[in-house]
Regions:
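Intrinsically disordered, low-complexity acidic regions enriched in Pro/Ser/Thr
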Residues: 1-172
């Protein structure tokens, strides 16, 4: 809510298209979560796009390697505790494989250890996807610059709210 107005920010993002279809559509999770999740190749997350590219390319490890790389996260704030669609990514000499594509969500009633929240994993049933490594890396290289060209209205996304001085974005 922004005053008396409820906001529904528009989030533009680059989607994963496999044989012309969205991964959300293929995973059958799209019907439930399609409006609620986006990739990190998005206008609100443009500063995270290079790191996301590196996770997808296998150059950096995801925060939770046992769950895989989060492909889609919350459209509002990118918080993984809202749930996310993830895949285990294996990079080989000539191919890149996405396996165990699953919806991961917090198990608020599950056991916790060391302050961590347990995550429940719901497999989508998708077969592993194998990509040609050269084509895959070419697509990732093109993605980051394209994110900067996506439309983004900061006021619409954040709302007309008071910003604390540390949120002004000034650099000293």
């Amino acid at each position: 809510m922004d005053g008396k107005y409820e906001r529904h920010p528009e989030s533009h993002y680059l989607d994963f298209r496999i044989d012309g279809r969205s991964l959300l559509e293929l995973s059958d999770i799209g019907g439930t979560y399609a409006k609620d999740v986006i990739t990190k190749f998005s206008a609100p997350d443009s500063e995270d796009a290079p790191h996301f590219r590196d996770e997808l390319a296998g150059r950096t490890s995801p925060a939770h390697p046992e769950l895989g790389v989060p492909l889609y996260t919350c459209a509002i704030d990118g918080d993984e505790l809202c749930g996310f669609l993830a895949a285990l990514i294996e990079v080989h000499d000539d191919t890149v494989t996405w396996s165990r594509i699953a919806w991961c969500s917090p198990d608020w009633d599950g056991p916790t250890g060391g302050g961590e929240i347990a995550m429940s994993v719901t497999d989508t049933g998708l077969a592993p996807m194998v990509f040609d490594r050269d084509q895959y890396e070419h697509a990732l290289a093109e993605a980051v610059p394209r994110v900067d060209d996506l439309p983004f209205d900061v006021t619409e996304f954040r709302g007309k709210r008071f910003l604390w001085p540390w949120e002004w974005g000034w650099r000293v």
